[in-house]
């Protein structure tokens, strides 16, 4: 299913609306779209000691039409909430109780994670990045890794059944 494709202007308009609603302007903060972001869908970047906002960064996979408008708005609002809470409190609040209270005030979940299904493009990129598949010889439990140590099979055992492990190199 394909949803609305977002661009920087759409994001800035939504951030401007949030700023007007909560009386904290963020129109001067740059917005960037990153193709490299795979673990997080959004990020609020600020200078460590002064808390001066640097930029909002959003994953290209979030904005490519794979996620519903509600999900995209929730991620953008979450990052705005980081900006709002840090600015009001005058210190980085990460995901503390003040941040969670502001999330509820803004009508979004206060989780540090999301339960969104990974888009097909993002899932494909993540799967491509794995170079090794590790399989337990006893129970068949499988994990994937990007890097492993030379003596991996000698030093480690299966976490479920303590069986020996076999490393399979994935073809690219």
Placement of each model-derived feature along the sequence:
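Metalloprotease/metallohydrolase-associated module, dominated by Zn2+-dependent proteases
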Residues: 2-70, 87-172
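Active-site recognition of the HExxH zinc-binding catalytic motif
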Residues: 74-86
């Amino acid at each position: 299913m394909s949803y609305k494709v977002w661009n920087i202007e759409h994001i800035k308009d939504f951030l401007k609306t949030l700023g007007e609603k909560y009386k904290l302007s963020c129109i001067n903060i740059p917005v960037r779209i990153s193709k490299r972001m795979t673990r997080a869908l959004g990020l609020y970047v600020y200078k460590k000691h002064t808390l001066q906002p640097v930029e909002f960064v959003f994953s290209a996979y979030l904005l490519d039409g794979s996620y519903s408008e509600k999900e995209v708005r929730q991620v953008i609002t979450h990052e705005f909430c980081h900006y709002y809470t840090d600015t009001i409190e005058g210190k980085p609040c990460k995901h503390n109780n003040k941040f969670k209270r502001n999330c509820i005030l803004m009508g979004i979940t206060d989780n540090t994670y999301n339960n969104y299904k990974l888009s097909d493009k993002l899932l494909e990129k993540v799967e491509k990045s794995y170079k090794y598949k590790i399989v337990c010889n006893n129970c068949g439990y499988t994990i994937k890794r990007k890097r492993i140590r030379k003596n991996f099979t000698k030093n480690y055992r299966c976490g479920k059944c303590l069986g020996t492990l076999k490393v399979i190199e994935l073809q690219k």
